[in-house]
Amino acid sequence: MNNEKKYLLGLTLAELKQVAKDLGMPAFTGGQMAKWLYEQHVKSIDEMTNISKANRAKLAAEYEIGCAEFSDAQYSVDGTIKYLFPTRSGKFVETVYIPDKDRATLCVSSQVGCKMNCLFCQTGKQGFEGSLPAGDILNQIYSLPEVDKLTNIVFMGQGEPMDNLDNVLRATEILTADYGWAWSPKRITVSSVGVKNKLKRFLEESECHVAISMHDPIPSERAELMPAERGMGIEQVVELLKNYDFSHQRRLSFEYIVFKGVNDSMQHAKAIIKLVKGLDCRFNLIRFHQIPDIPLQGVNDEKMEQFRDYLTSHGVFTTIRASRGQDIYAACGLLSTSKKIGEIRHHEDEKLKEEM
């Protein structure tokens, strides 16, 4: 017999009302639960004080909040903080908090590891260990010490969001719904390499900003960097995007890590200009952060600026993204929980030996 409790964090308003109904409570109790969860961020059912003690006891007999504090934190000299959060499956994901003047962005993970296996990404080297339920995605925000300072959320951590689309859509629904965090979808950006069928569904069902990982405009070269090119090519991705309006509130951006001698030539810049012609978009150029045993190198600042200036002068709005958290391996492409989990388990084993 399974005596494990179910979780409230990650349930929609309709589902919370159904929980109340199933336990013999008035439907409005579901609305009360939503307020306690998504407005007050309570840690226990007993904190839901406008629900009767008897009903709280009924609820607690079958459910728990489902939140979990971070297991580890690393602090960068530039103010960036990398958190390690446990998941309900007993695994871990990394989440990066990036403060910057009047903004504070949280980079959340949607999977443990990743299937995409991009050549330049440490997460892909970890392998794929599972997709996060919406509750685990939301817990990275819910249990963040700086949650009240957040201005933006980006789904650019571990995993491919489109490969876990049901849970990403559920999480963004709760973040943007009136009963949830009530955030504008314009405060949320979801990234993707481009996953066949899934990207179209996301564009139809969500109003959040979109960031496409391009990294090379030439399909044969992109396939060498990103195996996902063989599933849905960058040309197919761009053709799909041309069916949607990005000229108003919703923003489309392309991510482009610049590699020395690989994708940094004028040929590549011209191919980008031709490829995105007619699209209202922006380009973010990203510095490559060295990964062990990967035969790729970054370019110097002068080369980055030349590439940016050429694109900008030909009508493609382009910026160079500031690298944050390099000293704690929190920058783009560096997230991986493998080593840190080993350290934590070793520490737990040592602690257990001391207690025996």
Language-model segments: residues:
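Generic beta-strand structural signal
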Residues: I81, V93, A104-V108, M116, ...
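Ferredoxin-type iron-sulfur electron-transfer modules in oxidoreductases and energy-metabolism complexes
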Residues: G135, N139-V147
